[in-house]
Every structure is written in C-alpha cells, then in structure tokens.
A protein has these predicted regions:
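Short linear motifs in intrinsically disordered/low-complexity regions
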Residues: 10-12, 41, 49, 57-60, ...
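Feature captures outer-membrane beta-barrel proteins of Gram-negative bacteria and organelles
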Residues: 59-62, 84-93, 99, 109-122, ...
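Cleavable N-terminal export/targeting peptides
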Residues: 1-66, 265, 277-278
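Short sequence motifs at beta-strands and strand-loop junctions characteristic
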Residues: 78-80, 107, 134-136, 170-172, ...
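An anionic, turn-rich surface loop/hairpin at beta-sheet edges
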Residues: 224-229, 233-244
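Transmembrane beta-strand segments that form the barrel wall of outer-membrane beta-barrel proteins
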Residues: 67-77, 94-105, 111-115, 123-134, ...
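Short, charge-rich amphipathic segments
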Residues: 70-81, 173-177, 202-207
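Outer-membrane beta-barrel initiation region
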Residues: 35-110, 272-274
C-alpha cells in the first residue's frame, strides 16, 4: 500500500546503484563453482547394481513452484502517474528472503527487505513474515493454514508501525484474515478469504476468491476476484470490485490487475508485471 507523508528519501542515483549492486551480489552467490573431476574416478555401477533415478511424472508447470529464485518487474498505472517496482527473492531451505526497490518519479522512492519462514508439520502450516523499508516502515504478519486433508482453514494477522510504506499485497495492513481453501489437484486449488481492518476503525475489508488451474502441461492460470467495502481517507464509504490474472509458465510468468479505489483512494490502478523463475 502507499501512504504519502513528508519523508526524506534517498537520491535517485544512489537508489539505482543500491539495487544494481544488490542484484549483482545476490546473483553471484547463486552460482556455485564447478566441481573438479577426480583423475582416479571409479567406473559407474551398472544398471543391475544401482537404482536408476525415476523420472518426475509431474508436468513442467506443476514443478514451477520449486525454483528457488524469482525476479519480478512491475509497473503501476494511475491517472497521470506511473511507478515501478523491482523485486528479487530467493529461498534458503525453509527461509525466503527478498530485496525490492520502488520508484515513483513524482514522489516516493524506497528500498525494502524482508524474510519469511515456512513451517509445516502435520495439519499445521505457519508462515511468519517481517519486512522493513528505508522509510523506517515495518510490517509483520503471521499466515496459517489449518488442516491435514484437501480442505483447510485460513487464518492470519498483520500489523504495521503506520509509517509510509509500499507493499505488493494491496489489502489493509493492520488486519485479520479468515477464510477457507480446497486443493483440487497437485496444481489446482480454490480459496476464499476476507482481510479486514482491526486497528484504524475504517471498516475496510477485502474479500478474495482465487482459482488456480492448470491449462495444460506447460501453462497455468490464477484468477483473483476481490470485493471491497469500507471508508476511504475522505470518509466516503466505498463498495467496488476488481480482478487480477496471473499466468504461469515453468520458468516465467506475467500478471495483470485492475484495481478500482486502490487502497480505498479515489483513483483506479492498473498493475502489470513480468518475472523469471530460476
């Protein structure tokens, strides 16, 4: 979300250099040195004396979630303005970390870093997340899925320090989340949940209905319908709806969202993005 308040931002040139240097450092750590081949290597065992590796029966798009790194570039359009966001994230076992830069030529410029931990045991799935930015903004959340079968409950809570912030979720930041999900197959699933404000007394709530579906072996799609209600900054009560599309390939993706009254403001935002998985 974007909340505009007077802040001292970093210089644009320094902002660009920080992003570039960070990308170089992160990408360099992902490249492992080639292993040397021993001159005294023993002959490989025959097929009769070893178990051959079984081929993965899943389709390429079903394996796409297993890539450890993701680089996303987004452009956000509102009337008379355009903003840009670059996000690099990498998974380290159960931990995921990211660094991102947001640039609005007319106002906001900031960097943000974050991390989350993915814990699964039996019927319990917990994902705590923490993110901080160069505007001294902080955001923390705890997401959970409860259930051992195909159908599960969704519950979560999020909190910020109310400083100027920008994130990629576009829902109330100081909120509680409640919902339900159902796994149709290894890839397909449907979810419905509501995220509602519990701190600022705005009565803001966003209800999402998500449907993820495999089109064929190499393509998948997620549709995200959102229904909004609540008071905006002006006090006006808003009721509206938006839609998003996420198109998934094995090693890349694109997404497009139409978001009227973004963050319960008076204007509409269109968000477009493209990314790589590696």
């Amino acid at each position: 979300m974007i909340r505009r308040r007077p802040e001292k931002y970093i210089d644009v040139t320094l902002f660009v250099r920080m992003i570039f240097l960070t990308l170089v450092l992160v990408l360099s750590t992902l490249t492992a040195p080639a292993q040397q081949t021993s001159s005294n290597a023993q002959p490989s065992p025959s097929p009769d004396s070893s178990t051959a590796k079984q081929p993965d029966p899943r389709d390429p798009v079903e394996r796409s979630d297993e890539f450890k790194s993701k680089l996303t570039f987004g452009i956000y359009f509102i009337p008379g303005e355009r903003a840009y966001d670059l996000n690099l994230r990498h998974q380290f076992g159960q931990w995921t970390a990211w660094i991102a830069g947001f640039y609005d030529p007319k106002s906001n410029k900031l960097l943000r870093v974050g991390a989350q931990y993915d814990y699964k045991k039996g019927w319990l799935h917990l994902v705590p997340t923490l993110e901080v930015s160069t505007t001294r903004a902080m955001s923390g959340s705890l997401y959970s899925e409860l259930g051992s079968g195909k159908t599960y409950a969704i519950a979560g809570i999020a909190r910020t320090n109310l400083r100027p912030f920008f994130d990629l979720f576009w829902d109330p930041g100081d909120s509680v989340q409640l919902g339900i999900g159902h796994k149709i197959s290894n890839y397909d699933r449907i979810q419905g949940y509501t995220i509602f404000d519990v701190r600022l007394h705005t009565e803001q709530q966003n209800t999402h209905v998500l449907w993820r579906h495999k089109l064929n072996a190499n393509n998948g799609i997620t549709l995200d319908a959102v229904f909004k209600s609540g008071h905006g900054d002006s006090g006006k009560f808003i009721r509206t709806a938006g839609i998003g599309v996420y198109y998934d390939r094995e090693k890349w993706f694109w997404k497009l969202y139409f978001d009227p009254h973004v963050n319960f403001a008076d204007h509409t935002m269109v968000r477009a993005g493209i990314g790589l998985k590696f």
